Amino acid sequence: PDEFAAQVFAALVDPLPRLVRAAVPAMITRRSGKILVIGSASALRGMKRASSYSAARGAQLAYVQAVGVELAPHQIQVNAIAQNFVENPTYFPAEVQANPRFQERLAREVPLGRLVAAREDAQFAAYLCSEAADCFVGQVFPVCGGWVGR
């Protein structure tokens, strides 16, 4: 289990500070920038058999919150979308979506009663990267059809 957790953190957490360190100098020079991390809502709601994954995703979101505050004086906004139940052919291929058991799960666990459309997710991400969202600093936005609140 420890080796698995280390692998998950190496894949999901360790690259994030390197990405920020690479992108931030030019943003500081410009006094402007946006970094939007696409994370997982599993960090916001416990799930069975996903402790290492959820912990790594939680570390990502904690990093976003901290570095967001650190970079805000430079007019750089760092935020995250914590998603689950978003249309994605990798996680939810057509055969999964058509399965009655999956439809029952959506009805039971997701107040929206359906997957969040990829278009909805993309439009929200575009908004967060626009000037209209300059006021958000180190925020984590669940995009999951209400799954986190249940």
What positions do the PLM features span?
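Catalytic Tyr-X3-Lys loop
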Residues: 1-20, 32, 36, 60, ...
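Short C-terminal tail/terminal secondary-structure segment
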Residues: 45, 126, 137-150
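Alpha-helical segment proximal to the catalytic Tyr-Lys
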Residues: 25, 69-73, 134
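A conserved structural motif in NAD(P)-dependent oxidoreductases
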Residues: 110-121
